[in-house]
């Protein structure tokens, strides 16, 4: 396994992943529907996740696109960021969205989390991701979701890397095999005071 810097870990996850997403209430009971997420919908579901890390004139850029594969209505969501002083700073996602960071927990461990948790936006929506590389082409992600300052549910994701090339759509991408990879929506209103639930 490579070193444990943020860039090392981002590179470790580069590729196309097939994720199976399940949800649980705080007591561990399995959920059949996620009513609290940015995009409410059925559970479990499956998605393709394209993860790319590239150097742009000496600046390390991160790009990710999630594409629903089955279990929910078709949907694509893209987001990205830039490594600054060794830490991934995500592009702001929309009105009142906090600064999100990608930080390292050591080799094979990434955490996507707000830079600060003391703003009013955190009281409305807060969902840190804990991502772990299991070796080979396997990974897990755990997302805890808080709404109104209260824990609501936990997502558990089990992923298998199906391609090492995130620059091309895989053949079974619901959007079709041709076209740009990172063409999903990039804004969200879940942090806004008036927040229609429309984004994941």
Kindly give the residue locations of the regions a language model identified.
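Soluble ligand-binding/transfer domains with enclosed cavities or grooves
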Residues: 2-3, 7-200
């Amino acid at each position: 396994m490579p070193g444990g810097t943020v860039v090392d870990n981002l590179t470790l996850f580069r590729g196309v992943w097939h994720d199976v997403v399940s949800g649980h209430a705080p007591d561990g009971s399995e959920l059949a529907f996620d009513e609290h997420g940015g995009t409410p919908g059925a559970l479990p579901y499956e998605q393709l996740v394209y993860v790319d890390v590239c150097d742009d004139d000496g600046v390390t850029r991160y790009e990710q696109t999630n594409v629903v594969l089955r279990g929910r209505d078709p949907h694509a969501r893209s987001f990205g960021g830039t490594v600054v002083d060794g830490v991934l700073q995500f592009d702001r996602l929309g009105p009142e969205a906090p600064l999100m960071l990608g930080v390292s927990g050591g080799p094979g461990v990434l955490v996507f989390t707000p830079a600060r948790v003391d703003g009013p936006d955190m009281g409305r929506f807060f969902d840190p991701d804990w991502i772990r590389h299991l070796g080979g082409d396997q990974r897990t992600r755990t997302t805890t979701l808080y709404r109104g300052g209260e824990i609501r549910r936990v997502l558990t994701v089990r992923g298998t890397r199906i391609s090492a090339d995130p620059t091309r759509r895989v053949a079974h991408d619901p959007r079709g095999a041709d076209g740009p990879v990172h063409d999903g929506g990039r804004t969200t209103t879940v942090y806004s005071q008036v927040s229609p639930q429309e984004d994941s």
